[in-house]
Curated annotation (Swiss-Prot):
This is E3 ubiquitin-protein ligase TM129. The RING-type zinc finger domain is responsible for E3 ubiquitin ligase activity. It comes from the Eukaryota. It is an enzyme of class 2 (transferase). PANTHER family: E3 UBIQUITIN-PROTEIN LIGASE TM129. A zinc finger (RING-type) spans 285-350. Belongs to the TMEM129 family. Pfam families: Tmpp129 (PF10272). It is a multi-pass membrane protein.
């Protein structure tokens, strides 16, 4: 049986990681800095900038107390170590105690410095000052952002720890400890990366995330990256004034069918290959007439007389892309989690098949 100190350590590590990175379960339970300190932070809708100035400061202070919380907990989980008496503790614990004291002291001094000049020393205030007119201040920029954030036509997406917000004038990225801000009229946007995941934890369907670099012509504004679901790409472009360059030649799937098609292709490419006899020639795909047909349906999923699938005797008449589009078009659009395991009729002879039966012709 594990000792209480090991159990407490594992539990506290899990709690700390979840408290810092705040998964959906912690948000639902209200175990976040924003919820615990909501009375002091105020309302994001009323004063967006001042809310995040306080939130980032409070988050830094709260997170700096986590090591101290662990030490206090260990005093109760392992009383035989007598950790409450620092002079009797081992050297390693003495160093840890020093760290637990220095962290909140340092962050408190930093928070006090940020709060001077009515929060004028805060990193967000300094960032906004780069966008202020010569005869103006960061507070004028903050007022503009606050006003535009209250409008219902803004674009907002992402997890609470990495939100992307686009208003008529501003592009903002809100993270745990900072807020990046760029003015729309000054920016260049470039798609730099794309990551596709076979399953989304929320919908149990394939999902593609794209990364866009936001670079300002203002040399004092640091570039930053925003990350969003490809299905939101079209809505983002409508809100942006500047075009988005695709420097990495990334294929962006803006619909669920686009993402399914990529998954369909990758699965078919892993299936068995159909060897075409030497006296047969491939004809153009009857679906698009732009490429040769390269798909043959052969029942490989089960024995000949078993299961729902049937043997198709059609010659190769469809290309992989058109067959994938046909497969997607026959699915229940309300239940995408069933697409990969479903059966559909052959577009020519109506014999039922599944993805395992789709073979590339060689």
């Amino acid at each position: 049986m594990e000792s209480p100190e090991v159990t407490f350590t594992l539990a506290y590590v899990v709690f700390s990681v979840c408290f810092v990175f705040t998964p959906n379960e912690f948000h639902s339970a209200g175990i976040t800095v924003q919820n615990l300190l909501s009375g002091w932070l105020g309302s994001e809708d009323v004063a967006f900038v001042h809310y995040h100035i306080r939130r980032s400061t409070a988050t830094l202070l709260t997170h700096s107390l986590l090591p101290m919380g662990y030490f206090i907990g260990m005093c109760f989980a392992a009383p035989e170590k007598e950790l409450y008496n620092v002079y009797k503790a081992a050297d390693g614990w003495k160093v840890f105690v020093l760290i637990t004291v220095l962290l909140p002291v340092t962050t408190s001094i930093l928070a006090f410095y940020w709060s001077q000049k009515r929060w004028g020393n805060h990193p967000l205030a300094k960032t906004l000052a780069h966008h202020a007119l010569p005869q103006s201040s960061w507070r004028a920029v903050a007022s503009s952002i606050n006003t535009e954030f209250r409008r219902i036509d803004k674009f907002a997406t992402g997890a609470p720890s990495a939100r992307v917000i686009v208003t008529d004038t501003w592009v903002m990225k809100v993270t745990t400890y900072r807020v990046d801000v760029a003015q729309q009229q000054d920016i260049h946007l470039t798609v730099t990366d794309s990551r596709q995941h076979e399953l989304s934890p929320d919908s149990n369907t394939p999902v593609q995330f794209i990364t866009i670099r936001v670079a300002s012509v203002n040399p004092r504004v640091k570039p930053f990256d925003i990350r969003l679901n490809s299905t939101e790409y079209g809505e983002l472009r409508e809100k942006l004034h500047a075009p988005i360059r695709n420097a990495a030649n990334v294929v962006i799937h803006q619909t669920l069918s686009d993402m399914f098609l990529e998954t369909f292709k990758s699965l078919v490419e892993a299936n068995q290959v159909y060897e075409l006899s030497s006296n047969q020639e491939l004809e153009p795909c009857i679906g698009c007439m732009q490429t040769n047909a390269n798909i043959k349906l052969v029942k490989y999923c089960q024995e000949a007389n078993e299961g729902e699938c049937q043997q198709c005797y059609c010659r190769p008449m469809w290309c992989l892309t058109c067959m994938g589009k046909w497969f997607a078009s026959r699915q229940d659009q309300q239940h995408p989690e069933t697409w990969l395991s479903s059966h559909v009729p052959c577009p020519t002879c109506r014999a039922k098949f599944c993805i395992v039966d789709v073979c590339i012709v060689r």
